[in-house]
């Protein structure tokens, strides 16, 4: 019994103080803190992470406030999934560094005006439209407004410490308020269908990840200054010209599927490129990919590509999607022994002898082809899942 008591004391997440026990009784579950500057865990001695049960009410949050104020640690509070719609009970919580309100009926965030300790705020899937209350929160480093009604970003002009900003599926149109955010590293605008002009982003020298999927962006000429960009997403946009990307040697991920792009010469020399998605584009010539020895994932599905000789020496390729292309000759793949996934469905391919030495293949999709020697291929690749 003594041993059991000791174990319970050690593993009980709220054994440290009466305040934490009270918080547990009110419906809070203790979690793991994350460093605001990284993905590493922060010691419990420095941080208190609390997640509310879905049944949490505003009155319970109000009752928790005195106990939260007694903490000498920074606080990360997750109220996501609750029915809390009023934040007044949080006023005076000076040590709050992270607040997650995902999928709550919150619409008014005026109660956050004086929370200058906030570094991370998540308003994903709330009814928030007006974010004027944030204009003085200059310590904010991460702000998530995904799937909200927000359209005006003026309040963000002076939040110069922002590192991450998620504006996906918002009503945002004017990006000028973002032009002077020197530390912004990640900007997500996917699904913000009113966005057309991204010239204001040209001065964001720290930007590493930019998501413009499902926007109306048709020109990226001003983005040529973003030499530190590592990931760029432009799926399902009216974009045709990617010449601005020439010389962007830091790019690791480039997603263009469903765009109007037909020329990828700008990809020449992108030696760091790891993932390239060209599905459903007008691309027919992939010679620009010669020499991109770092490429691991290439998607050419639903294009008119016919010749894949440019892939002959791309030994790092792990996934290749040629679904519904015009490729007939796959001899250039013979030496790509690192391939793990190969999709050849609905192509004119007939001869697959070139694949017999690719013993690392985990999945090979051949349905909709005229391949005749599948039995021989199965014998040569006993560990490969072949779908045909």
Give a label for each model feature.
Residues 13-29:
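Ser/Thr/Pro/Gly-rich low-complexity linker/stalk segments immediately outside membranes or between
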Residues 31-37, 45-63, 72-89, 95-111, ...:
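Concave beta-strand-loop units of leucine-rich repeat
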Residues 1-10:
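Hydrophobic membrane-insertion alpha-helices, especially the h-region
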Residues 10-13, 27, 92, 322:
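Intrinsic disorder/low-structure terminal segments
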Residues 22-25, 63-67:
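Charge-rich, solvent-exposed alpha-helical interaction surfaces
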């Amino acid at each position: 019994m003594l041993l059991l008591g000791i174990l319970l004391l050690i593993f009980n997440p709220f054994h440290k103080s009466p305040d934490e026990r009270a918080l547990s009784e009110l419906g809070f579950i203790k979690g793991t803190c994350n460093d605001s500057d990284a993905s590493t865990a922060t010691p419990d001695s420095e941080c208190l992470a609390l997640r509310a049960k879905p049944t949490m009410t505003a009155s319970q949050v109000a009752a928790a406030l005195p106990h939260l104020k007694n903490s000498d640690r920074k606080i990360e509070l997750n109220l996501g999934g609750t029915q809390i719609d009023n934040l007044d009970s949080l006023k005076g919580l000076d040590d709050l560094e992270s607040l997650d309100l995902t999928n709550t009926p919150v619409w008014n965030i005026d109660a956050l005006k004086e929370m200058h300790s906030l570094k991370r705020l998540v308003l994903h899937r709330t009814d928030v439209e007006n974010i004027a209350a944030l204009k003085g929160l200059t310590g904010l480093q991460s702000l998530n407004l995904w799937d909200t009604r927000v359209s005006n970003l003026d309040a963000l002009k002076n939040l110069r410490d922002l590192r991450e900003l998620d504006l996906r599926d918002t009503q945002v149109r004017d990006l000028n308020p973002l032009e002077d955010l020197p530390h912004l590293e990640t900007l997500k605008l996917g699904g913000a269908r009113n966005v057309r002009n991204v010239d204001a982003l040209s001065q964001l020298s720290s930007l590493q990840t930019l998501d413009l999927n499902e926007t109306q962006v048709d020109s990226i000429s001003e983005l040529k200054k973003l030499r530190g960009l590592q990931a760029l997403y432009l799926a399902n946009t009216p974009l045709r010209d990617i010449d601005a990307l020439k010389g962007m040697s830091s790019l690791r991920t480039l997603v263009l599927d469903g765009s109007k792009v037909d020329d990828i010469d700008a990809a020449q020399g992108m030696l760091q490129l790891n993932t390239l998605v060209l599905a459903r584009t007008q691309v027919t010539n992939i010679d620009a990919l010669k020499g991109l020895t770092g490429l691991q994932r290439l998607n050419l599905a639903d294009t008119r590509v016919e010749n894949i000789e440019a892939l002959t020496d791309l030994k790092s390729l792990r996934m290749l999607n040629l679904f519904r292309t015009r490729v007939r000759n796959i001899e250039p793949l013979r030496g790509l022994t690192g391939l793990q996934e190969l999709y050849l469905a609905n192509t004119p391919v007939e001869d697959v002898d070139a694949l017999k030495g690719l013993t690392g293949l985990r999945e090979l999709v051949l349905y909709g082809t005229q391949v005749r020697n599948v039995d021989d291929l199965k014998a040569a690749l006993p560990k490969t899942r072949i779908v045909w």
